Structure formats: structure tokens, C-alpha cells
């Protein structure tokens, strides 16, 4: 029996929606990264974008365990000399774009390269409860019931 290798034309992509209210960031990110890559499928092929389209709503209501909300620091560089900037997870979650915490967690679990960028394009994260993708009829995925550790009281 030969090893199965999916062709891009054979891949069928589903749309799933996840409500992130009260979910632990790292556990949510691992599950979503595997879904984006297609590793949950028996037909997974490493060089083909065979993952699903994932919509995450209520990303502003995610939970960080321990003291990570106050202590976790996100760095970026402006490109100028001495231009390293830092922000805590708390300041990002309370700021203008709270969904960036979830996006960065997932982005850092996806391989860097052309295929990884394409797979990250299948991710949509919204801070509030609404999303404009009702026409795609996304299936809800309840992450909280998969494992009791996935959910924390805020």
C-alpha cells in the first residue's frame, strides 16, 4: 500500500467557530493551530494546506493561568536603534485590539514560511461576539467540553 498524499484540489475545507469565553489561551491556541494545519485529519499532508477555516469570537474574554496576565511580556522592535518595545498581556487585553494575544499564540505555533502564512490566512479572530461569516455556515466547536482543563473561571 502506498503512502497517501493529498492534492490541493482534493482538499475539502470546513468552517468552524469557537467561542473563546473563559478558555485558557495556550490550550485554545494548540487546538486551533492543529485545526489550521489539518493535523486532526487522517488525510494530513505536510506540504498541502488541508486545514479548516477557524473563526474565534469573544477573544477578549480569554484567560491566562497563573500570573501571566500581569507578568507575560510581548516584545516588538520599531526598526530603529534602541527601538525595542514591550507590553504586558494585561495591557493588550484591555487595549484596542485584545484579539492579538490569541493571534500571536496561534501564530507562534504555526511553522514559519509560505505555507504557514497561507494557513494563518484561514484564521479570523474577533474580540466581540459577532462575526461577518454567517454565509459560510460555520459549525460550532465546543472546546470547553473536550477537557476540563480547557476552561477557567475568569
Swiss-Prot record:
Keywords: Ribonucleoprotein, Ribosomal protein. One of its GO terms (biological process) is negative regulation of translation. Disulfide bonds: none annotated. InterPro entries: Ribosomal_uL13, Ribosomal_uL13_bac-type, Ribosomal_uL13_sf. It holds the Pfam family Ribosomal_L13. GO terms for molecular function: mRNA binding; structural constituent of ribosome. The keyword tRNA-binding does not apply. One of its GO terms (cellular component) is cytosolic large ribosomal subunit. Belongs to the universal ribosomal protein uL13 family. Part of the 50S ribosomal subunit. PANTHER family: LARGE RIBOSOMAL SUBUNIT PROTEIN UL13M, RIBOSOMAL PROTEIN L13. NCBIfam families: rplM_bact. This protein is one of the early assembly proteins of the 50S ribosomal subunit, although it is not seen to bind rRNA by itself. It is important during the early stages of 50S assembly. This is Large ribosomal subunit protein uL13. The gene is rplM.
Amino acid at each position: 500500500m502506498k503512502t497517501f498524499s493529498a492534492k490541493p484540489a482534493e482538499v475539502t475545507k470546513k468552517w468552524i467557530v469557537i467561542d473563546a469565553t473563559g478558555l485558557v489561551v495556550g490550550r485554545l491556541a494548540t487546538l486551533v493551530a492543529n485545526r489550521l494545519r489539518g493535523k486532526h485529519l487522517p488525510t494530513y499532508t505536510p506540504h498541502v494546506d488541508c486545514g479548516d477555516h477557524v473563526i474565534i469570537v469573544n477573544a477578549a474574554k480569554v484567560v491566562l493561568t497563573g500570573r501571566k496576565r500581569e507578568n507575560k511580556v510581548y516584545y516588538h522592535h520599531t526598526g530603529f536603534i534602541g527601538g525595542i518595545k514591550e507590553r504586558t498581556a494585561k495591557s493588550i487585553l484591555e487595549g484596542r485590539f485584545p484579539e492579538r494575544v490569541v493571534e500571536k499564540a496561534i501564530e507562534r505555533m504555526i511553522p514559519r514560511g509560505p505555507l504557514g502564512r497561507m494557513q494563518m490566512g484561514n484564521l479570523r479572530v474577533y474580540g466581540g461576539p459577532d462575526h461577518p461569516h454567517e454565509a459560510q455556515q460555520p459549525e460550532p466547536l465546543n472546546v470547553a467540553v473536550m477537557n476540563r482543563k480547557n476552561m477557567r473561571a475568569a
